[in-house]
């Protein structure tokens, strides 16, 4: 549900526009930096890296954009330039690691995974386009669903749940991370639901942020081995430091060297703010470490430390970002 809401909130132009493309290049740079760092830690070449090393490198490039959405909205940053930059850079920290997981942590041949990924993405785009056309043409099926959306039938909510479960199931069947299916469901909804229609969004927010998303964090926390974390405090701090080095520093450099007037107008403090927000990472760390633990390549104690570090970033990074944020230099896009 966390990733469905993230996909639903994102305007495709945000990640395909100029700053979005810069965000992609920056994420690729963070990926290269992460692998360089991990290879030096493991004293191995790229081809010699084990699954746990690959998982660690991917985890260093993640951004918990779904967890950041409500924070940005509550602080009034979501509709401002700072929020737009967080989405442009942070969204690739959500999408990129999912694709990297599929390609690098899969037991299949890479070319087979590429074909499956391409097929899945094509299917999602096709459903989105057909759904959008049906909505614009006021097709009979869409009209029936519209009439029941605010009644006890709650047709839009039911279709959303069906879409979410269906795409997550397809992802699982083809051994793709279920995050991809959930995000695709949000992407499809974005195209089908009219832009100014916030009724469904409010209902999904109530279901997600009121129950399912807190449940996800509770379950993630319940899996943490507290003794393992307490016994390895330096590893915990070290991983957070690596996240800052790999994720925050490249994003700050990309923003600081951007010559666009709007980005330059943010000032270095708001550029630091964007970088700190984008270093918030938990959900995909849970996903990456789960794959490595299931494969027997990572111990549950190490996974617990990494997940705990991710949880700390969700608490600490937004707090630090609040301290560096300068509203007077942040233009509104509302």
Task: Please report, for each region that a protein language model flagged, where it lies by residue.
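Structural signal for the N-terminal portions of transmembrane helices
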Residues: 1, 23, 86-90, 107-122, ...
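Membrane-interface junctions of multi-pass transporters
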Residues: 1-22, 140-239
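C-terminal ends of transmembrane helices
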Residues: 4-19, 66-79, 129-143, 188-202, ...
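Short helical (or helix-break) motifs at transmembrane helix termini and adjacent helical loops
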Residues: 9, 33-38, 58-85, 91-99, ...
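Entry/N-cap segments of selected transmembrane alpha helices
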Residues: 10-46, 51-57, 110-126, 224-258, ...
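Membrane-interface alpha-helices at helix entry/exit sites of multi-pass transporters
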Residues: 19, 78-92, 115-116, 198-201, ...
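Hydrophobic alpha-helical transmembrane segments in multi-pass integral membrane proteins
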Residues: 35-43, 94-108, 162-176, 215-230, ...
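Juxtamembrane and boundary regions of transmembrane helices in multi-pass small-molecule transporters
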Residues: 44, 112-140, 255-266, 309-334
């Amino acid at each position: 549900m966390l990733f469905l809401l993230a996909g639903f909130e994102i305007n495709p132009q945000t990640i395909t526009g100029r700053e979005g493309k810069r965000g992609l290049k920056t994420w690729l740079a963070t990926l290269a930096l992460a692998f360089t760092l991990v290879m030096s830690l493991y004293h191995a070449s790229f081809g010699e890296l084990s699954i746990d090393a690959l998982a660690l490198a991917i985890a260093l490039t993640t951004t918990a954009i779904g967890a950041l959405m409500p924070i940005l909205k509550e602080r009034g940053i979501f509709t401002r330039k700072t929020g737009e930059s967080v989405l442009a850079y942070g969204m690739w920290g959500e999408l990129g690691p999912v694709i990297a997981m599929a390609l690098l942590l899969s037991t299949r041949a890479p070319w087979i995974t590429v074909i499956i990924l391409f097929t899945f993405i094509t299917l999602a785009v096709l459903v989105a386009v057909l759904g959008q056309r049906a909505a614009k043409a006021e097709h009979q099926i869409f009209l029936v669903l519209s009439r029941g959306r605010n009644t006890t039938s709650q047709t839009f909510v039911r279709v959303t749940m069906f879409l979410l479960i269906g795409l997550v199931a397809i992802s699982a069947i083809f051994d793709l991370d279920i995050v991809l299916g959930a995000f695709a469901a949000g992407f499809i909804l974005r195209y089908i639901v009219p832009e100014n229609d916030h009724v469904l969004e409010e209902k999904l927010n109530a279901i997600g942020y009121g129950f399912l998303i807190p449940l996800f964090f509770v379950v993630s926390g319940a899996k943490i081995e507290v003794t393992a974390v307490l016994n390895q405090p330096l590893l915990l701090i070290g991983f957070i430091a690596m996240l800052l080095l790999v994720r925050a520093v490249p994003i700050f450099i990309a923003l600081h060297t951007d010559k666009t007037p709007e980005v330059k107008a943010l000032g270095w403090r708001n550029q630091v703010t964007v970088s700190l927000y984008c270093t918030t990472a938990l959900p995909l760390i849970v996903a990456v470490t789960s794959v490595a633990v299931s494969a027997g390549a990572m111990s549950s104690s190490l996974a617990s430390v990494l997940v705990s570090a991710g949880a700390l970033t969700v608490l600490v990074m937004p707090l630090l970002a609040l301290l560096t944020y300068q509203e007077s230099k942040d233009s509104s896009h509302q």
